[in-house]
Amino acid sequence: MKLEYSKGILFIRFINNIDHSISYKINSLLIPKILSEKIKYIALNMYEVNDIDEFGLDALLNMKCAIRTNNGKICLCEVSDKLKRKLRNIRIKKVENELNVLNLIGAI
C-alpha cells in the first residue's frame, strides 16, 4: 500500500489484494494516524486489487468510521466489476478515478 497526502486528501493506493496482513496494518497503524491527525478525506485506489477478504472489508468499514468521526468523506476509485460486487454492502462512494475524487471533494 502506497500513501500520498495531497490537497488535503490522503490517497491510499493498494498494490495487492486486501487480506488479513493488509487489514492489520490498516487497523493498527493507519486508522490511529487518521484519527490523531484529523484527516478528513481519503481516496482508496483499488486499481491493483483483485480480491478482498472479510478482514479487508472490516478494515475498510473501520476506516469509514474513522473518517466519519472526523466529519470527512471516503471514496473508492478504479474498482473492478468483480470488486464492486464484494464492496456493494459497505456503502462507500465509488468514482471512476482519482481526478473524480478531487472534483467530488472540491479540491480543484
Q: Regions from the language model: what does each represent?
A:
Residues 1-50, 62-108:
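STAS-like cytosolic regulatory interaction modules
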